[in-house]
């Protein structure tokens, strides 16, 4: 998507403040030492500021009486730094405009605001944080976003970055979660409610000062619901029995939801702690092979689903199985036959057991109550591969 940004020639980075003492003729510093400009009579000074000659910075100004300032070396260095910062800002603003158009393409209903081109000078004050400017944009320097295009109202960004929620809507949603408020009957306020106080599903407060004019609700006296309000003139609403049951049911639902959320959070924390404490099973332990013989295998990733299935092809499992197969083909390990150990048996039984053990070609004859010792050289000389 091509984005054309027309650069506007900006002379703010070439602007220098004129020395007021020099204008009065009382500056004791020469122009090569004063941090302010000492312009000549041919230079144009507006509002105590003068524009430096761009050609003079390049060393190619050939005008006899130039109306722009030819700065001394120390001011020239400052202007060169300002020029580099201006170029960086122009590139950043071009990227900013491109990202805004991309964001507008993703949200067709949102209007695209024009981005003015402006520069950053050391004398300009930085604006507020630009993080709330657009959720699709990365961290941008606060000076790159002008104050007139920043949102004035505080914004809350939801999980979908393209749908920012105003703070007023979030506050309204928070008020709806409160169980100590009841909506006032509008017909009762007009004097047209045919239902009585004990039949209407809305509140009929006797005192209009209890009503919150922002959302037309009244705050319920929780002490009255618990049967312990002793105020002579309570500023909170004392609801009838059917509205008390409604409030108690809402409180029960909120408490149940909070308990379920706390249980889910605790379970997630416990599961993460168990996963962090689990030690992956070594492949050398699975095969009964010394660790010095085999190279380390890649770790086998655990499946995330509880049913043991995965919906996508996992390259980590494939690498683990391939490394395991290569290990079986390349490393020739010995097959260790089972040697029976019979504790408390008769000599005849032990001799029968050792006879079965000595039937293996490479096993040495074992005496009673002894395990045949096989050297590592003998194991490597016989090519027996373990059966997987």
From Swiss-Prot:
Repeat recorded as keyword: yes
Tissue note: Highly expressed in cardiac, skeletal muscle and during myoblast differentiation. Weakly expressed in other tissues (at protein level). Expressed in heart, brain, placenta, lung, liver, skeletal muscle, kidney and pancreas.
Stored SMART domains: ZnF_C3H1 (SM00356)
A Gene Ontology term for the protein's cellular component: cytosol
Residue numbers carrying Phosphothreonine: 6
Zinc finger (C3H1-type): 13-41, 47-73, 179-207, 215-241
Main location: nucleus
Subcellular location per the Swiss-Prot or TrEMBL entry: Nucleus; Cytoplasm; Cytoplasmic granule
Keyword Kinase applies: no
Protein family: Belongs to the muscleblind family.
Name of the protein: Muscleblind-like protein 1
GO biological process: embryonic limb morphogenesis; in utero embryonic development; mRNA processing; myoblast differentiation; nervous system development; regulation of RNA splicing; RNA splicing
Subunit details: Interacts with DDX1 and YBX1. Interacts with HNRNPH1; the interaction in RNA-independent. Interacts with RBPMS; the interaction allows cooperative assembly of RNA-bound stable cell-specific alternative splicing regulatory complexes.
Clinical condition linked: Dystrophia myotonica 1: A muscular disorder characterized by myotonia, muscle wasting in the distal extremities, cataract, hypogonadism, defective endocrine functions, male baldness and cardiac arrhythmias. Corneal dystrophy, Fuchs endothelial, 3: A late-onset form of Fuchs endothelial corneal dystrophy, a disease caused by loss of endothelium of the central cornea. It is characterized by focal wart-like guttata that arise from Descemet membrane and develop in the central cornea, epithelial blisters, reduced vision and pain. Descemet membrane is thickened by abnormal collagenous deposition.
